[in-house]
Amino acid sequence: MKSKLWKLAGILFGVLALSAMAHAGWIDPDAAMAIGVIGNMTNAQARVVDPILSTVAQGYKNGRMVADFLFPVVPVDQRGGKILEFGKEDFLLYNTARAPGADTKEVQFGHLGAAYALEGHRLMGKVPFEHLQEANQVPGINLGRGAVTKTQNIILLASEHQAATIARNAANYAASNKTALAGTSRWDDYVSGISDPVADIDAAVEAIRAQVGMRPNTVVLSPKAFKAAKRHPKIIDRVKYTSRDSLTLEMLADLFDVERVVSGDAIYNNAGTMTDVWGKDVVVAYTEVATADDGGVPSFGYTYRLRGNPMVEMAYQDRNAKSWIYPVTDERVPVIAAAAAGYLIQTAVS
């Protein structure tokens, strides 16, 4: 018994001595120390972190991203199925009167349209052992959270770009639900007196209302369109008596008479050129943002996402790269459910 105690004491003394010498700068921690001391998270510990980091990924929001305003998330349990699409009948007022003995009218909300298939998006965040050494801590919530949020930000950018590509595709709209501004009609023409952002939004609102019986509640502006709008003489003239020094998105929402106006400020690297995800366009739509658990509510679009995603898988050590790896998976796809509830204004600015 005494010999075992002496052995344990010797091992403990050796570890403390090595640690003290490393902190004092007498020796450099080698790979074994990085893996055995700083990088020593057991599988049980990793399993504890996984649900926490999955919650981080699921709750993470980037203020530059606005896709969810046009394509609110609907959790699904299958990776494929039919899009629940909506026609004009889903938005119109019904005569609910019933005569004695008459049959009760039936209403079916939505119909199964084109097939959808969730797309799997997966990216792995890396935390090098060297960073852990410098931070003098084991890999856990803090560095893991940083790796997950940065990885999730990249996945969100890809999702934003995909949604913007769909929303900005003129082929997805009927002729009555799109326009392309040109020349003096563009919002950044302040001289001719012809361009009029408010009139353009009013026309979009009326086009949607006339078809689906509901006023659109969302306007997504590209950053260039937002910049042009808040500097436009006709808009400034309408708000010049307010106490604000500069025009805000909330003020534009009041002016356009919609619930929300958002600016899609995300950019991406396009062959070395930083490019606006939302280009020069404007999208007006009726969307039901509060439909996360109900896919049966009419809306311009949805993002079908596998329930429980995004998901952070069990962290593991890559000893060759001397790093902890945090895989993040997100299975989802944005779809248009009611094209008549959207309106596209292309090339709102030059």
Regions found by a protein language model. Give the residues of each.
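Short acidic, glycine/tyrosine-flanked loop/strand segments centered on an H-E-D-like triad
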Residues: G110-N136
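N-terminal secretory/membrane targeting signals
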Residues: M1-I27
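Alpha-helical scaffold segments that mediate packing/assembly in large oligomeric complexes
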Residues: F129-R215, P223-D237, S350
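Sequence/fold signature of self-assembling virion shell proteins
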Residues: K2, H23-A97, L112, Y116-E119, ...
